[in-house]
């Protein structure tokens, strides 16, 4: 039987490239079957993992974008509040500075007025005492001159 098969195979002409026998469709079906098995067992799970990962990345990116926008809005609000607070603080400082300067000027004016008044009273008092002293001195001078005159006129007494 082996001889017959060998004779049959050796007597048959090969068709070369265009020799189609049952092996070509069998190999093609095996290839397709392997591709189907690989697709089901490896590629679909890997594709699912890749899609899940892509969705996760997109969600995370979207969440990060929203957080970034909220952060920018919050930062802008805080900057406005800080700027407003700085303006209010500066206005308060200016107001207090103006009030303090006004108070200092008023105190200075009051002090100058009281000093002038004190000096004026002191000068008036000094003039009054001067006049009084001059009167007393004049009276004493008159008395003394009267005594001298009397002694000169009446040397015996």
From Swiss-Prot:
It is a single-pass membrane protein. One of its GO terms (cellular component) is proton-transporting ATP synthase complex. Pfam families: ATP-synt_B. It is found in: Plastid, Chloroplast thylakoid membrane. Keywords: ATP synthesis, ATP-binding, CF(0), Chloroplast, Hydrogen ion transport, Ion transport, Membrane, Nucleotide-binding, Plastid, Thylakoid, Transmembrane, Transmembrane helix, Transport. The chain crosses the membrane at residues 26-43. F-type ATPases have 2 components, F(1) - the catalytic core - and F(0) - the membrane proton channel. F(1) has five subunits: alpha(3), beta(3), gamma(1), delta(1), epsilon(1). F(0) has four main subunits: a(1), b(1), b'(1) and c(10-14). The alpha and beta chains form an alternating ring which encloses part of the gamma chain. F(1) is attached to F(0) by a central stalk formed by the gamma and epsilon chains, while a peripheral stalk is formed by the delta, b and b' chains. F(1)F(0) ATP synthase produces ATP from ADP in the presence of a proton or sodium gradient. F-type ATPases consist of two structural domains, F(1) containing the extramembraneous catalytic core and F(0) containing the membrane proton channel, linked together by a central stalk and a peripheral stalk. During catalysis, ATP synthesis in the catalytic domain of F(1) is coupled via a rotary mechanism of the central stalk subunits to proton translocation. Component of the F(0) channel, it forms part of the peripheral stalk, linking F(1) to F(0). The b'-subunit is a diverged and duplicated form of b found in plants and photosynthetic bacteria. In plastids the F-type ATPase is also known as CF(1)CF(0). PANTHER family: ATP SYNTHASE SUBUNIT B', CHLOROPLASTIC. Belongs to the ATPase B chain family. This is ATP synthase subunit b', chloroplastic.
